[in-house]
């Protein structure tokens, strides 16, 4: 099975598809054994089983029956490839044959619809910032009201609005608009909040109100769950309430920012859900119009003379409030993730709102982080509504309360995960590595929210430390069978249809001695580039940017020294196999990307870009690392061209896709013809068609992209042409003469050609 087919069917893509047989050999490979896995990958031929799975009874195993199991029909038993335990088959599996084979023995990926009941529908808790301009707030209200029509009628809804104070709206009151008002400058605790809202002190463990009405009980005028009511019951009142919202009336002195209690609002929202809906699917959806200016969670002082922190301020420890704000929001993130709740953050302003400090709220829960200039923009409106996209059966594509366990045979141990999840530390698994990459020290992770587009990077360590085992031998009695390492991904989650489901993917990879040609041939350079990029982005959160780039360079050099063909000290002899040849190029563009080169970005922009990158699959991640460039001309059909300054020509139109924005660039000659209006003359219909062609292709790219990319239409000499030029390899820069009508790029960045020349020189010299 090739890389793409495995990804389409199983949602998994490995860096190496044949593993080295020992740990030391794997370490010599430089690029770690790992995979990019999309648990809820959409697949038309996915088998869905309407029953509970058959689970292995082996200690510390709990893996699920799969096609790699050895079935013994005579004894009605099966052997688990993960732990080699023998298990009895249930009575309904007694008459197995080639014609009568259950779905789980036919498919490496299967989904079970279990009989575990769903007791409470999902909860959507809107947290709205009122310190906004009227036009911006009106657009936001319109989008929220539209989104209500996309939610299940039985979904529970809550509403908080805030400015200088936090207002918790009581939707149970039919006759009047009633809300509880809290101080914006106070960090409330669950006990105090519960007592204020119910009149009773909580006495249960962990601050839970054990004697109070809980999520399962009837809503009463004094119960904590009165703030969350079914949409079908409160839709009219909620729409009326939203329509009547107006900007915060608190006066803002000249030279000051509005007083904005974002931290307190999020704290109250998370505590309220913990108090009555712990481990029940819930989303806190925050709409922020600016930075928090009130502690707790203060991002910047209200005086405009105090600027928002920059990357330089953070790196030099001059960001006065940064560490304290990070600590506050990280505490909320830990609470929310532990309770199975999700936080989505939508920013609608030109200013930074503090995404850099708040990023753990979304990154640890699978929530959305979206940075836009205003709530009136198409990017916000369409991206927000795409959050509530539905499948062919009319159910929301979002899934809730996910939990993913990775089971491995004794050949592998799990090092960690990089993606939007949090660790489940209480686990009896025995396949956990002592060395960690990303979120480690566990083989089980919690995903409060996940979707068909959430992908996770998972890293493995070869467990075998000795080279004395025969890698061609597997279990006793299998002399001719290759030695396989088995991995099973078990993802439990709540489907939006109101059912509990389990998605199971089982894969097998051969283990061979180091130096075997099959190992090199199994290298997936695209998956490897994305997984190494995720490690680099993860390192960049704590390490110096220059150190991360040096680490990338060292790993690239070592990989080339290991797998390139060359004569020592002869750069001209350097050759890479086709499945390695693009990897240096990916590394070059990654070094220049906004994920690692943050010079021209704000901390919020960096948090946003890294958030999106660490959730996407291989294809989309590669577009972010190395954008695609397509050329349109009168002479040729549309064709992909090099991401290089030599591709910019006067008589072509270029379409650039960076994932975050899509740009159409008209060459100098094309731009002149367009300004002259030739496209309006019927005799130049071909020119008109040429102008329309990139627009049609751009529209196709926009259909399913989340978040919606920014669209830029520019031309040679235009102010926004810089967005294209900044992404190009500067093979023609101001130090050289432009060739063949190509464009000169004003930059001091090293070109790809010089990068490759230097790589070859260092690799063949034996340096690292």
Curated annotation (Swiss-Prot):
UniProt superkingdom: Eukaryota
GO molecular function: GTPase activator activity; zinc ion binding
Compartments in which it is found: Cytoplasmic vesicle, COPII-coated vesicle membrane; Cytoplasm; Endoplasmic reticulum membrane; Golgi apparatus membrane
GO BP, sorted A to Z: COPII-coated vesicle cargo loading; intracellular protein transport; macroautophagy; positive regulation of ER to Golgi vesicle-mediated transport; positive regulation of protein exit from endoplasmic reticulum; regulation of COPII vesicle coating; reticulophagy
Keywords: Acetylation, Cytoplasm, Cytoplasmic vesicle, Endoplasmic reticulum, ER-Golgi transport, Golgi apparatus, Membrane, Metal-binding, Protein transport, Transport, Ubl conjugation, Zinc
Residues that bind Zn(2+): 56, 61, 80, 83
Entries under InterPro entries matching the protein: ADF-H/Gelsolin-like_dom_sf, Gelsolin-like_dom, Gelsolin-like_dom_sf, Sec23, Sec23/24_helical_dom, Sec23/24_helical_dom_sf, Sec23/24_trunk_dom, Sec23_24_beta_S
Membrane topology (UniProt): Peripheral membrane protein
GO terms for cellular component: COPII vesicle coat; endoplasmic reticulum; endoplasmic reticulum exit site; endoplasmic reticulum membrane; Golgi membrane
Keyword Ubl conjugation recorded: yes
Residues that bear N-acetylmethionine: 1
Post-translational modification (record): Ubiquitinated. Ubiquitination is required for the formation of the SEC23/24 complex. Deubiquitinated by the UBP3/BRE5 complex.
Function: Component of the coat protein complex II (COPII) which promotes the formation of transport vesicles from the endoplasmic reticulum (ER). The coat has two main functions, the physical deformation of the endoplasmic reticulum membrane into vesicles and the selection of cargo molecules. SEC23 interacts with BET3 in order to target TRAPPI complex to COPII involved in internalization of plasma membrane proteins like the maltose transporter.
Quaternary assembly: The COPII coat is composed of at least 7 proteins: the SEC23/24 complex, the SEC13/31 complex, SFB2, SFB3 and the protein SAR1. Forms two other heterodimeric complexes with SFB3 and PDR17. Interacts with BET1, BET3, BOS1, EMP24, GRH1, SEC16, SEC22 and SYS1.
Similarity section: Belongs to the SEC23/SEC24 family. SEC23 subfamily.
Name the record gives this protein: Protein transport protein SEC23
